[in-house]
């Protein structure tokens, strides 16, 4: 039993399936696209306003492929968590970490970490290895299974520790 629930979903793509899923579950949601703003700072200011209006105190990233800027970090430092599909520091910052770790046959695993000013350089919270498979599709499936197993456990521990 989790002491908190997902109360808000945000996407940086208006057509993201997660927004449809949130609607079906009755979870408040919104989307903004960077191209709608004159600068990343303006984009992040608008996002912070939305998050503050929803009283969000912990941000969980999944598939958010933008670098979190100083506007977000100033407001939510130590409150943004990311899941990365490699055993960091291997393939930090790579948008193709699954493919690259599979091809290299190292860095095989996932990492849950706090977001800081760098790219995939924040404090590591948890890591688990993922067994190599010669098929990229099978390996990718294993990575996603590991993410779905570890991420909720880590978040639950963080929430319980904050209370």
Language-model segment annotations:
Residues 16-17, 35-40, 118:
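A short acidic, often aromatic-flanked loop/helix-cap motif at beta-alpha or helix-coil junctions
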Residues 23-31:
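Short, conserved SAM-binding/catalytic segment
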Residues 16, 40-45, 70, 94-95:
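Structural motif corresponding to alpha-helix initiation and N-cap regions
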Residues 1-17, 21:
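N-terminal Rossmann-like dinucleotide-binding module
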Residues 30-35, 83:
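Short beta->alpha connector loops at strand-helix junctions that form conserved
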Residues 12, 58, 62-162:
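Donor/substrate-binding cores of folate-linked one-carbon enzymes
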Residues 35-66:
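Short phosphate-binding loop-to-helix
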């Amino acid at each position: 039993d989790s002491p908190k629930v997902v109360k808000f979903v945000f996407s940086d793509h208006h057509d993201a399936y997660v927004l449809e899923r949130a609607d079906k579950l009755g979870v408040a949601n919104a989307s903004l696209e960077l191209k709608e703003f004159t600068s990343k700072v303006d984009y992040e200011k608008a996002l912070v306003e939305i998050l503050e209006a929803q009283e969000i105190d912990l941000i969980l990233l999944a598939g958010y492929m933008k670098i979190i800027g100083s506007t977000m970090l100033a407001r939510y430092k130590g409150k943004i968590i990311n899941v990365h599909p490699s055993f960091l520091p291997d393939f930090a910052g790579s948008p193709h970490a699954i493919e690259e770790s599979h091809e290299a046959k190292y860095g095989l695993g996932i990492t849950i970490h706090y977001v800081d000013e760098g790219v995939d350089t924040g404090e590591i919270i948890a890591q688990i290895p993922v067994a190599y498979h010669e098929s990229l599709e099978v390996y990718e499936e294993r990575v996603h299974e590991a993410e779905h197993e570890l991420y909720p456990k880590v978040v639950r521990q963080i929430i319980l520790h904050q209370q």
